[in-house]
């Protein structure tokens, strides 16, 4: 090490006081190793079951799992009622902070029970029954959580659609799920201004022939003007506000579907990931208690993710509430009205556990430490990272600046498909390594394998860098139960690559070090990870080609220090199209309009042609080399290797 390089620690053991009082002890690993199914049965029995399960796991129909067979429970009862019945009704369930300063609401568990019961009665009055689907297209407001729990209470599947998605994205999800009801708001606040939301909902519904949606339930959030369809559109405050606050929950089978959540797929069509009740809630509750070490009597937990993403489902709704924890929900952006907002919220509510994405951490780093340093963040006792691998520099900055150099930091790896966290340090046990998600949780089994499914040896310093595939070799309770309406796609997407081994293929590259720590390196397929959001290349390419001037498009993810990956597009224009100075910006805007602002390409390069194999396949791997200014890889299968001279000249 040179004298100019400051020495930094390679691992960070937990403080003695934290370790002494941690929920998870080292014995958990031994217990799970000795009898994995008995271990999961013990975790499941922390929930309230109306009918006990008779079998922990039925894997006879692999890769379709059945967990806690024969058991019956109600997810909403486990998240709300049982805490009230245990005498904790006065405990705050949700501190909600709106984006406009001073806009706040506090709901105790008793308040939440009344609101969820009213919403459940209202949905029943609208004719919804168990097994129906409800689309939820809302900003991060209490009604979003209430709507989710009301659906869970009735055995209705909710399909939450991120409020930043466009009408086209909403339309595709409504059609695929055949949703019977849409819950939305008049608008939402973004960067201090109200923006319409119902208008996009109206546009989506208008584009659906023989639309399955019978009613649209509208929350008044901003007061902005909007179109109204008499008979179809109903005000939330009228319908839910007048409903009875008394409702008796019905138990459902452990495998009863709980929700659909759509995620990007390499074919372009979003995949409806299906999760069920008992297994999902078991692992959700378990990981919340062990990874985040929650103490319901004293902790205030804040997961910054929107509920439109799986992190918002699992650690913004079900995880905290099934453990009886107090949580913070914040509607807006981190820089509204200024860059102090997140730190003001931590200080205001005494947040003790803060869970966010590396993109936001890197943004805070750019802003400078003087902003967090001007706030009292001493309430924080644990930090978490989610959504993408975190680089060691950001990890250390996060711990040192936000955590005061004293808090454990849990870097969690998981996916929409896994339902809950799978790989993470346990904060009272692990000596965490910056940049590593560490080891699979007790009860979880993962491997790093080569193309043949054989385990790779640990990577050692100075050795050739070998990246393997991250696979899961044993079923887990919160695993997806399929892709809605497409079992063949489920098998092909996750199980076909290593079908002879029975491994779940996560789609991420990873390596393992001599200590057994796993280092996840990111996506290896054609799904890009932009600020923790998975965007498929096919979706973006489709949006580009829809433009009248574009003949062909190819999109790749490239390294970006702020968002992990940024989208770089290469387009071939139609011969009769006259490009102009604003062509690239016009295409960027079009992608943002069709998909989401998140999917807006950072770079758009107009090129004369795209590199293709002799079979006509676009070689994105080589385009990625160009975008990253690297030397080209193997070009032997290219139809015309000279194409890159023209591409580089155009770039």
Swiss-Prot record:
One of its GO terms (biological process) is acetyl-CoA biosynthetic process. Gene3D superfamilies: 3.30.300.30, N-terminal domain of ligase-like. Its EC number is 6.2.1.1. Optimum temperature is 37 degrees Celsius. It lost its activity rapidly below 25 degrees Celsius or above 45 degrees Celsius. Pfam families: ACAS_N, AMP-binding, AMP-binding_C. Mg(2+) binds at residues 545, 547, 550. ATP binds at residues 387-389, 411-416, 508, 523, 534. It catalyses: acetate + ATP + CoA = acetyl-CoA + AMP + diphosphate. Coiled coil: none annotated. GO terms for cellular component: cytosol; peptidoglycan-based cell wall; plasma membrane. Magnesium, but can also use calcium, manganese, nickel or zinc ions. GO terms for molecular function: acetate-CoA ligase activity; AMP binding; ATP binding; metal ion binding. CoA binds at residues 190-193, 311, 531. Optimum pH is around 8. The enzyme is stable under neutral and alkaline conditions, while its activity decreases rapidly below pH 6.0. Acetylated on Lys-617 by Pat in the presence of acetyl-CoA as an acetyl donor and ATP. Acetylation results in the inactivation of the enzyme. Deacetylation by the SIR2-homolog deacetylase CobB is required to activate the enzyme. Belongs to the ATP-dependent AMP-binding enzyme family. Could be also autoacetylated on Lys-617 in the presence of acetate as an acetyl donor and ATP. Autoacetylation is effectively inhibited by CoA. If CoA is not available or the concentration of CoA is low in vivo, the enzyme can transfer acetyl group from AcAMP to itself, resulting in autoacetylation and inactivation. When CoA is available, the acetyl group is donated to CoA forming AcCoA. Catalyzes the conversion of acetate into acetyl-CoA (AcCoA), an essential intermediate at the junction of anabolic and catabolic pathways. AcsA undergoes a two-step reaction. In the first half reaction, AcsA combines acetate with ATP to form acetyl-adenylate (AcAMP) intermediate. In the second half reaction, it can then transfer the acetyl group from AcAMP to the sulfhydryl group of CoA, forming the product AcCoA. M.tuberculosis may use AcsA for both acetate and propionate assimilation. This is Acetyl-coenzyme A synthetase. The gene is acsA.
């Amino acid at each position: 090490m040179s004298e100019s390089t400051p020495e930094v620690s390679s691992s960070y053991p937990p403080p003695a006081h934290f370790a002494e009082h941690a929920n998870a002890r080292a014995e958990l690993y031994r217990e799970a190793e000795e009898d994995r199914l008995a271990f999961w049965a013990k975790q499941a029995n922390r929930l309230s079951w109306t009918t006990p399960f008779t079998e922990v796991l039925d894997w006879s129909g692999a890769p379709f799992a059945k967990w806690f067979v024969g058991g019956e429970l109600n997810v909403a009862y486990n998240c709300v009622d049982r805490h009230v019945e245990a005498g904790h009704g006065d405990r705050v369930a949700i501190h909600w902070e709106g984006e406009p300063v001073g806009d706040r609401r506090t709901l105790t568990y008793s308040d939440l029970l009344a609101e969820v019961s009213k919403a459940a009665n209202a949905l029943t009055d609208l004719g919804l029954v168990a097994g129906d689907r409800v689309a939820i297209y809302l900003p991060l407001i209490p009604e979003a959580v209430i709507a989710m729990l009301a659906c869970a209470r009735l055995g209705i599947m909710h399909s939450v659609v991120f409020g930043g998605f466009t009408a086209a994205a909403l339309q595709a999800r409504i059609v695929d799920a055949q949703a019977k009801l849409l819950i939305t708001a008049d608008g939402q606040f973004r960067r201090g201004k109200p923006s319409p939301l119902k208008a996009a909902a109206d546009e989506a519904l208008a584009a659906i022939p023989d639309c399955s949606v019978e009613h649209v339930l509208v929350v008044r959030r901003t007061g902005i003007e909007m179109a109204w369809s008499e008979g179809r559109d109903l005000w939330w405050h009228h319908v839910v506000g007048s409903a009875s606050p008394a409702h008796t929950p019905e138990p459902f089978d452990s495998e009863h579907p709980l929700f659909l959540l759509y995620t990007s797929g390499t074919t372009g069509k979003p995949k409806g990931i299906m999760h069920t009740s008992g297994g999902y809630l078991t692992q959700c509750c378990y990981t919340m208690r062990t990874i985040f070490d929650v103490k319901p009597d004293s902790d205030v937990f804040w997961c910054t993710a929107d509920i439109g993403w799986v992190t918002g489902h699992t650690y913004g709704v079900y995880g905290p509430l099934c453990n009886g924890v107090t949580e913070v929900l914040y509607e807006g952006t981190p820089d509204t009205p200024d860059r102090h907002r997140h730190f003001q919220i931590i200080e205001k509510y005494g947040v003790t556990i803060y869970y966010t994405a590396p993109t936001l951490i890197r943004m805070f780093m750019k802003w400078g430490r003087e902003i967090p340093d001007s706030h009292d963040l001493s309430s924080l006792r644990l930090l978490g990272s989610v959504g993408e691998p975190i680089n060691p520099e950001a990890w250390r900055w996060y711990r040192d600046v936000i955590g005061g150099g004293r808090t454990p930091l849990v870097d969690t790896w998981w996916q929409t498909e896994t339902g809950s966290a799978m790989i993470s340090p346990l904060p009272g046990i692990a000596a965490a390594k910056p940049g590593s998600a560490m080891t699979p949780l007790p009860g979880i089994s993962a491997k790093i394998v080569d193309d043949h499914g054989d385990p790779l040896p640990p990577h050692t310093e100075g050795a050739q860098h070998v990246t393997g595939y991250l696979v899961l070799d044993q079923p887990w309770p919160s695993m997806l139960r399929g892709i809605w309406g497409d079992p063949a796609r489920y098998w092909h997407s996750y199980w076909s690559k290593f079908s002879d081994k029975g491994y779940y293929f996560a789609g991420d590259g990873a390596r393992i070090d001599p200590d057994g720590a796993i280092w996840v390196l990111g996506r290896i397929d054609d799904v890009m990870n932009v600020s923790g959001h998975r965007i498929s290349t096919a979706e973006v390419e489709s949006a580009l080609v829809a433009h009248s001037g574009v003949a062909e498009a190819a999109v790749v993810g490239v390294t970006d220090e702020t968002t992990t990956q940024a989208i770089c597009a290469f387009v071939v224009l139609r011969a009769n199209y006259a490009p102009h100075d604003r062509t690239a910006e016009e295409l960027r805007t079009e992608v943002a309009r069709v998909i989401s602002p998140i999917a807006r390409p950072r770079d758009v390069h107009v090129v004369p042609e795209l590199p293709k194999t002799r079979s006509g396949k676009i070689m994105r791997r080589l385009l990625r080399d160009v975008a990253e200014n690297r030397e080209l890889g193997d070009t032997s299968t290219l139809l015309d290797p000279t194409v890159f001279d023209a591409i580089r000249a155009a770039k």
